[in-house]
Amino acid sequence: AFLKDQHETVLLNPDFTNYLHYNLLFKCKIIEDKNPTELMKAIKNDIQIDHLKACHINDGIAMTKFMYWLKKNVGKIPMTERMISDHLEEERKKLPDYMGPSFETICAYKDHAAMMHYQSTEESDVDVKAEGMLLIDSGGQYYGGTTDVT
């Protein structure tokens, strides 16, 4: 908002600037172009690549342990969508660089799997059995990067 009374030069991408903000800059000289840092941020250096590899390997370890637990126990012990989601979170918490989920885990069984961005609640949580489809979309935030696994 402070720019509305300025006579400065402003670089903006009109594809990502809403009408209100664009019009607040009427006294400014506007240069329409892409953000020059976008390409620089898209190219990872060797250290960033190494960190991303490490976090994906570690997340893969947590996912493998989780999948083993799930396959070994589904249909043998009581489990619900929320219990399964919680168990996956516990596996990730065992990892040294784990900081938390990168987004809320979607654990959707049978009909719930067809609902986009479904989130299990106390009311909607259902028992999971050794039949039908179980969709899990989850991710972890690690010191070296972020994962997203479906």
Q: Model-predicted segments: where are they?
A:
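Active-site neighborhoods and metal-handling regions in enzymes and metal-associated proteins
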Residues: A1-T150
